[in-house]
Each structure stands twice: as structure tokens, then as C-alpha cells.
């Protein structure tokens, strides 16, 4: 059996640019890519917390330390500057591998200040 698992996630980053006329993609600060394990040109899903839209694109690197999250091309219709989004990538693996797999998650606040990283998502309590 093959399972699709969360590989990396940027939780609640703020969109800093939306460029309709730039060639597709989502430019992400290289520090953020490193923290989440997302690679340049990797397929990503973006879930817009602000407006509820969900879309897919691919990641490209933005300047390290810039805190840039730039939604580009047609995807710019799905996000505006200031929107809060979650960016995730997924990986496929065997059932055996999935049972011990840990994603790389980075949590953000304010103007894309990385507050912490984790290897798991906390259990949701009642």
C-alpha cells in the first residue's frame, strides 16, 4: 500500500506579494523552504485562511531572510497581500514508512516571524 503523507508545512504565513503577471509559482523565503523541507520546483498546496480558497502551484526560492511569500501568475487571483495562508507539500511512501514518518512544520506569527518548528502536529483536544 502507498500512502500520501504531509511532508512539510508553513503554518499561517502572510502573503507579502501577489503578482498576476509573473510566471506562475509561489516565491518563498529560502529560510522558510529549509525549515519546512519544501524544495524549489516542488508541487505545493496553498490554503488561504483569510478567504477559504485552496489551490495548487509550485515553490520557487525567494531571497533568504526576506520573509517573502509571493503568490504569482493565475494563483494571484486566489490571494491578496496580507492574507494568511498555509502552504503544504506531500510525499508518497509505503505504509511501513508512513507509520514512523514525521513532517517538518514551521509556525509563523505577525509579519512572517518564524516562532517555532516541529516534527509533528499537536493532538487536537476537545
Swiss-Prot record:
Gene3D superfamilies: 2.40.40.20. Its EC number is 4.1.1.11. PANTHER family: ASPARTATE 1-DECARBOXYLASE (PTHR21012:SF0). This is Aspartate 1-decarboxylase. It comes from Salmonella dublin (strain CT_02021853). It catalyses: L-aspartate + H(+) = beta-alanine + CO2. Belongs to the PanD family. Heterooctamer of four alpha and four beta subunits. Pfam families: Asp_decarbox. GO terms for molecular function: aspartate 1-decarboxylase activity. GO terms for biological process: alanine biosynthetic process; pantothenate biosynthetic process. Catalyzes the pyruvoyl-dependent decarboxylation of aspartate to produce beta-alanine. It is found in: Cytoplasm. Keywords: Autocatalytic cleavage, Cytoplasm, Decarboxylase, Lyase, Pantothenate biosynthesis, Pyruvate, Schiff base, Zymogen. The active site is at residues 25, 58. The modification Pyruvic acid (Ser) is found at residue 25.
Amino acid at each position: 500500500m502507498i500512502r500520501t503523507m504531509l511532508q512539510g508545512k508553513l503554518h499561517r504565513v502572510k502573503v507579502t506579494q501577489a503578482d498576476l503577471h509573473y510566471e506562475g509559482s509561489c516565491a518563498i523565503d529560502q529560510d522558510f523552504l529549509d525549515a519546512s523541507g519544501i524544495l524549489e520546483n516542488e508541487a505545493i498546496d496553498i490554503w488561504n485562511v483569510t478567504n477559504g480558497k485552496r489551490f495548487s502551484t509550485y515553490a520557487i526560492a525567494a531571497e533568504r531572510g526576506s520573509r517573502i511569500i509571493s503568490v504569482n501568475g493565475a494563483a494571484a487571483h486566489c490571494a491578496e497581500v496580507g492574507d494568511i495562508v498555509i502552504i503544504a507539500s506531500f510525499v508518497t511512501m509505503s505504509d511501513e514508512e508512513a507509520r514512523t514518518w514525521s513532517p517538518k512544520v514551521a509556525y509563523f506569527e505577525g509579519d512572517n516571524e518564524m516562532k517555532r518548528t516541529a516534527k509533528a502536529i499537536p493532538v487536537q483536544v476537545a
